[in-house]
Amino acid sequence: MTNLNLPSLFVPLVGLVFPAIAMASLFLHVQKNKIV
């Protein structure tokens, strides 16, 4: 395992997982407060 592969692995992971968690938490927050 080289260190050169680490950034190219973490960038899409953070770029996809973080927005997914943000959208999911926002969705659950809206569902819990019944704002819709």
Swiss-Prot record:
Parts forming coiled coils: none
One GO-annotated biological process of the protein: photosynthesis
Stretches that traverse the bilayer: 8-28
Localisation per UniProt entry: Plastid, Chloroplast thylakoid membrane
Record membrane topology: Single-pass membrane protein
Main subcellular location of this protein, as a coarse class: plastid
UniProt family annotation: Belongs to the PsaI family.
Protein name listed in UniProt: Photosystem I reaction center subunit VIII
Organism: Brassica oleracea
